[in-house]
Regions:
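Mid-domain catalytic core of redox enzymes
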Residues: 302-419, 449
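Conserved flavin/dinucleotide-binding core of flavoenzymes
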Residues: 4, 8, 17-18, 23-26, ...
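Active-site/ligand-binding neighborhood in enzyme catalytic cores
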Residues: 154, 161-162, 185-305, 313-315, ...
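N-terminal glycine-rich phosphate/pyrophosphate-binding loop and immediately adjacent elements
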Residues: 43-187
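Rossmann-like dinucleotide-binding core of oxidoreductases
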Residues: 150, 164-165, 173-180, 184-193, ...
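Short glycine/proline-rich turn/loop motifs
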Residues: 48-51, 111-119, 263-277, 419-429, ...
């Protein structure tokens, strides 16, 4: 629900209130009941035993789903070949560094001008602690990880029409919202209005918990004092010497927090998917894709654009165009095919599958997303504002500003995620702009939160996923209705072809979904082979 709309509470806003008032555990339980959260189904390395009968498998796509399939099938004894559109492994597991050149639809070319050591992840950028398959493959492939700072209490929440447009610290909004809610609950408890819900013996325990949870005083009131300051910070912090005494800051009235609607953003940290600990590969997310590719050796044929997929009772024939010889159409045959091409692309390729799978492929639209990386002369967010990692949220079209979790407290340049726009009108509006204009707008909007932007900005790159040639969108965007009707048909083996990828999972847009989908697909394919 957008600011200024009618006061109808959506499912997401209901979850936000549950999470901010009752805490992340309560929110996770609510999300699970609504089908929005679950632990990874990964149970450890897959075991494909039995006679593979010298079978061959063609894998289409060298993203994480495709490379997972290729590695596991080769280990089981299959003859494996991989065709990949790009000239690099990883698919959406992608990192841009200085010197990289990327051309999107519309022939807009961007050359990344980042300084040495700086990078930007246009696709996935974080790994939850419970995405066990991704973490296990990182361990097995020796991909070094470091913490990704999701929640930084010193980062900012911003609403253009609230507090005179001034951003507020997350800790201030969170602490004051919690304290005011605790005071209200304590008040109705002492007035006996919860007697039907709370036993007499539990009443005092509830009041004690509210006092502790909300930093209330002896009268169960939330107000500005040094006890409150221990949670929300100080107007003047404790120091040493004659001027050492701390001074508490003023609290924000509940009415102002509610009116600002900044409480909405607190759910982003309570949601199970975003709870600490989060991880990132040291040096960029593509370290995962590169590690897979090293393990695979020469299995991957890069620069291969698939133009036709045919099958009969004896096998699969795929036609493709090699970027080194674009005038010629080449073919490759195999007994089986694991296809991980995004549905947004696959729906445009002639494909010999049954009507049910074809309908499923055509039924899934892809989400629009825009991510913009901005390099600055210095890490002003650290030096001026003591923001080390984390994410700030805003109602401006850029939606998010994320601060790097690597190279903390170092001098020199730094790269921010200057915008992460997922779905909604702003995502499509930014995608329609040339990259230079996207960057200019991100700098303009960001300067309303960090005034240092315009003086410190150097260069940037802007990725609009609907204009990315190899995906034409960010990720599969299932509706509940489409999933109920088409999901099983999408995942079933059709003759000698099986699909895999984040779109064939209940974790769309996450690398975990891609890997789990792939493991499930190759396990079922292998079972069919050994039983033939």
């Amino acid at each position: 629900m957008q600011n200024g709309s009618t006061a109808i509470v959506t499912k997401r806003e209901l979850l936000a209130l549950i999470g901010t008032i009752a805490g992340s555990a309560a929110m996770y339980n609510a999300m699970t009941s609504l089908g929005l959260a679950a632990d990874s189904a990964y149970k450890g390395p897959i075991e494909l035993s039995g006679d593979v009968k010298d079978a061959s498998v063609l894998v289409l796509g060298a993203g994480l789903a495709g490379m997972t399939a290729a590695l596991e099938l080769r280990k089981a004894g299959y003859k494996v070949k991989v065709l990949e559109y790009n000239h690099r492994p990883g698919g959406r597991n992608w990192t841009l560094r200085g010197g990289d050149v990327y051309t999107e639809l519309g022939d807009f070319a961007q050359r990344c001008e980042f300084a040495e050591g700086q990078y930007f992840n246009p696709g996935p950028w974080r790994i939850p602690y419970h995405h066990r398959a991704v973490l296990d493959y990182c361990k097995r492939l020796n991909v070094a990880l470091e913490p990704f700072v999701e929640l930084n209490h010193n980062a900012l929440l911003h609403a253009s029409g609230a507090f005179g447009g001034r951003p507020q610290r997350i800790r201030d909004i969170e602490t004051d919202f919690r304290g005011n809610i605790a005071e209200l609950l304590a008040k109705v408890t002492t007035q006996g209005k919860l007697d039907e819900a709370v036993s007499t013996e539990d009443r005092e325990t509830l009041l004690a918990s509210l006092k502790s949870w909300g930093a209330l005083d002896q009268n169960y009131a939330y107000k500005a004092d040094l006890e409150t300051a221990e949670f929300r910070g100080y107007a003047k912090g404790p120091g040493g010497g004659l001027s050492a005494a701390p001074v508490a800051g003023e609290t924000i009235p509940l009415s102002e927090i509610l009116k600002s609607r900044l409480w909405r953003y607190l759910q982003n940290f309570a949601a199970h998917l975003f709870q600490t600990t989060m991880f990132q590969p040291v040096g960029g997310m593509d370290m995962i894709g590169k590690a897979f590719a090293r393990e695979m050796g020469d299995l991957i044929h890069y620069g291969a654009k698939v133009v036709n997929i045919a099958q009969d009772s004896g096998g699969v024939t795929v036609s493709y165009v090699d970027s080194k010889d674009p005038a010629a159409v080449q073919t490759v045959k195999a007994d089986w095919c694991v296809c991980t091409i995004p549905l947004s692309i696959l729906s445009q390729i002639p494909l010999n599958v049954g009507a049910q799978m074809k309908a499923a492929i055509d039924a899934v639209p892809y989400a629009s997303a825009v991510k913009i990386g901005l390099q600055f002369k210095r890490r002003f967010w650290e030096e001026d504002e003591a923001i080390y990692g984390g994410i700030s949220f805003t109602d401006l079209p850029i939606r998010q500003i994320a601060y790097p979790s690597s190279d903390l407290n170092r001098s020199g340049r730094g790269v921010l995620l200057g915008a992460y726009i997922f779905e909604g009108a702003s995502a499509y509006e930014f995608a329609a702009l040339p990259p230079a204009e996207r960057i200019a707008r991100a700098v303009d909007f960001g300067s309303r939160i960090h005034p240092q932007y315009k003086g410190e900005f150097e260069n940037g790159v802007a990725i609009a996923w609907h204009r990315v040639p190899f995906t034409l969108g960010c990720a599969g965007y299932w509706t509940d209705e489409a999933r109920a009707q088409h999901y099983d048909d999408l995942c079933q083996i059709d003759g000698r072809i099986v699909l895999a990828g984040e779109h064939a999972s209940y974790l769309p847009a996450w690398q975990e979904g891609a890997i789990l989908s792939s493991l499930d697909a190759v396990a079922r394919l292998h079972e069919r082979v050994v039983k033939m």
